[in-house]
């Protein structure tokens, strides 16, 4: 609330992290009421309890979610029973929420006053961290390039990636914007499964004894390959999955042939080729360096300044001589050789 934010600012806090449930309107009001920077959640797992204050794990398993030891109680399957004991819904994951993904609302959040974004990453692996952070860096930079008069990066340097970031290709239970725009009709739950489902890859066209034919989705990011994990929701409403042994075009050969209904939609829950790429070095961050080589009365000077504002000048006492041919290109070529450093010559 505005009052809580003002109290925290008065107490000396230099940054405030907003609750996941905070709407855009409330974010805007808080930003107008305080001077400290605001940070907001933008991606990752959601807790079914209000603002993550959950005591179910502690009560049932002796593991406090408020101390980082959540037993994932809300990801279990439950029955929904009425007052007379009749089962209305059986064996569904009634408390399991989708994962947050606010990619489409980044600019709205920035305009509302958010100055940094928080990605939930409890128990996530290195591949997840690489892909998701690179994805949001890319999306934020697009906004900054389009509106340089309004926003600038808080950090320096440029990261060169060896892969194309895509948040849909990392672990997720399906996505939701949560309550950013208030309580809407858009689903926030994932009743079928608490596990990763992944993006749609296509529909089953034909089934054989050891293989099936896939009609690929128009949004298929990469071909199906051996090692991929595919899944589908069965007639009982439960998620079923299998690994791909090999793929020959649109003909898919599973390790173990599942009972696939014709026309069923398949998702890729494990992207083998993408994870293999992310397991290797995937980024190099460099700082731009401006270099000036000039004459001074006692010899020569070399001035270097990076984009953070750090500046160094070196002086060399040498006698001035007139070269028979211009040395300008040779000097530029030599000074541009920065080797294995974190710098790249800008000018």
Show which residues each predicted segment covers.
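Surface-exposed amphipathic alpha-helical tracts and adjacent flexible/coil segments at the periphery
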Residues: 6-347
